[in-house]
Structure formats: C-alpha cells, structure tokens
Amino acid sequence: MLFALVLCALTAFAQDNDKILNRQYADQKKIHFGFSVGTNFQDIHIVNNGFQTEDGETWYADVPQHSPGFCVNVLADLRLAKNFNLRFSPGMYFGNKVVKYINSSAPDEVTDPLRRNQSQNIKSTYIVLPLDLKISANRYHNVRPYFTGGVMGVFDVAKDRTEQLRLANGDAMLTVGMGCDIYLPFFKLCPELKFCFGLKNVLQKNRPDLEDNPEMMRFTQSVDKVTNNMVVLTFYFE
C-alpha cells in the first residue's frame, strides 16, 4: 500500500511536468552508477516437527510480527539492449526478527511463564550482493515502469553465538521486483519493491555448544527447517 501511494504521487508529479522530457539521453549510457536507501522487512519461514522433550513438552516456533529495518546500496547498471539492463547493487541491510517459542503441551496449572513461552530477538546485519536483470517498458513521457529478477548473495555479520536457534551466516536468495523510473530534471528516481526468497535451510542443527544444556537444545530439536524471506522497498537515485 505504501509503495503504491508513493509511486502514484511521484508519477503524478512527473506527469505534471511531462511537457518537457527530462534527461532524454540517460538511458543511452552503456554504464551508469547510483545509490539507494530504503527499508526492509525480514522474515523467516519455520518448519516445526512436533519434537517432544523427556518432560513431555512440545514446543513450536513462529514469527508473529515484523518490524522495519534500514538498507543502503550502491549501484552499477550495464545497458544490454533497449529494454534490458544488468544491475549489481551491493549494500547492507539492517533489521531484526523476533521468534516466539510456544509450549503447546503446557497444562493450565503451569504458572511459570518460561515454561509456556519464550522469545528470541535475532538481529541481523546483512552484506548483500544482488545481481538483477531489469526488463523495462518503453518510456512514456517522464516515467518508465519495469520488472526485475535475479539472485542475491547474503552474509550476516552480526550473529550472537548463544542463540536458541542458530542460523547460518550465508544464504542465497531468488529475487523478483517491480518499480518505475521517474525522470526528474537532475537525476532519475526509481522506487522499487522487491521480494526475496531464501534457497537453503539456514538452521544449524549441529549444536555441540548445547549438548549439556537440554533446556536450550529443545528449541533446535523442535525445528526441521528455516528459510529466509525479505520484502525490500528502495529508492534509487541514478
């Protein structure tokens, strides 16, 4: 919704000034550079297995809510053809995910809150290496919509080594997105919405550090698979 409102407002502004074609030769450059700032919503998809502890407890994990993070990238754009560009935009994504652990087998008489539910705040600082193919429509006055698709390498450099669930530092993601080039007098503004889907199971099942701590190990034992997902809203300045 936010992306649609911002895009409509910027497009309307560009159309109000469409009698003059801004930056007419911007798309003719073989290579150009830029940067972006934006926000991201990080999520993980958790597959629970119904593991039961020696005490008869069954825990499951979920991410019930999401909070926005911040992202910044630099951009190198290579023109392949009239409507095709290859874009490399390394950067950093900052965000967090709160995982809730619920004891679904806790009887009503259990009053200790830690026997009913716990939580884990997973803070992430991602170094990202996205490579995207940009497929653009023909320019209409001062706007030009486009779609993107690509892959993105992800490396988390802010891991807490004592987490209940420990996630791998590296991941690979498929990305699809949409946006619009808006040609302003001095630069091109490109709001873009991108969806990122993790390709690997990032859960680290081998936890020798928790062999003597079954109270912590039960959370890892209760989960079979964890995959990363993200929604990213960025504003490119080119």
Q: Each PLM stretch: what is its role?
A:
Residues 185-238:
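Predominantly the C-terminal beta-signal and adjacent terminal strand-loop region
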Residues 42, 49-110:
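Glycine- and aromatic-enriched membrane insertion/assembly motifs of diderm outer-membrane
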Residues 31-37, 86-90, 127-129, 145-151, ...:
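Transmembrane beta-strands of outer-membrane beta-barrel proteins
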Residues 39-43, 92-96, 135-137, 151-157, ...:
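Transmembrane beta-strands of outer-membrane beta-barrel pores
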Residues 14-68, 230, 236-238:
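Short glycine/proline- and aromatic-enriched beta-strand/turn motifs that initiate or cap beta-hairpins
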Residues 29-31, 66-70, 123-129, 143, ...:
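Residues that define the transmembrane beta-barrel architecture of outer-membrane proteins
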Residues 45-52, 99-105, 157-165, 202-209:
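Outer-membrane beta-barrel translocator domains and adjoining extracellular loop/strand segments
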Residues 28, 81-83, 138-142, 183-187, ...:
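Outer-membrane beta-barrel channels and translocator barrels
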